[in-house]
Amino acid sequence: MSREPLLEIKGLRLDFNQEGKSVEAVRGADLKVFEGEILGLVGESGSGKSVTALSITGLLPKAATVRSGSIRFDGMDLLGMPEEDLRKIRGAKISYVFQDPATSLNPVFTIGEQIIEAVTLHQKAAGAGAFDIAVSSLKDVGMPSPEEMMHAYPHQLSGGMRQRAMIAMAVSCRPKLLIADEPTTALDVTVQAQILELLVKLKRDMGLTVILITHDLSIVSQVAEKTAVMQQGMIVEYGDTELVYRKPSHPYTMKLIDCIPKMGKL
């Protein structure tokens, strides 16, 4: 008996209206994500990766319009869901981590205040209970001195620590799905590896399902069980990561692999 996917996107078509002209950004995308796995969504800038991810919970800009398709998550039809119900899904069941935590975190509030806000909203915890959940979330992501970090402001943290804080906020409500959109791009190589290891750890310890969005196929090959390759708004290849990496079937995937630096070649 085959497993049902946690998230399934079918025939998604989405366009942007620019100065009276319609520009198609996603052209019939199909995607399945199964519970407890990391799926790498790979493609160059402008291929439609991020806008596909944002469409899952209706976080699209006003200029964007979903023309057709379906998005089902945990048995629920997200495209047909009222905004009020979608708000209950965001953060509680589906969380996002974006590329630059410096712009995602509010500079005038402490890390603790921002995590507590999410916990209070989605878990209905308050006071000492919300504080304890926030501290526990910082511990989960390997933040040193989590009690002290609760009182730190974003500008007082390094890039890697800010990203850990963002991930802590994202997992504080124990979502089923974490969408990480280029979470390592703004980080140096050493910190990048630490964040990737953290995503694998959270998947293992929490049973988290992860969509890892990146332009770098080498990153996906390190952590993801499945890989979907996106080009010009379409999923052109999907399968087990090892098979996609070792025996790509689409010319675009082959080109992405050719872009990966290899030892002994300049």
For each feature predicted by the language model, list its residue ranges.
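ABC ATPase "signature
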Residues: 235-239, 247
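Conserved ABC transporter NBD signature motif
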Residues: 66-77
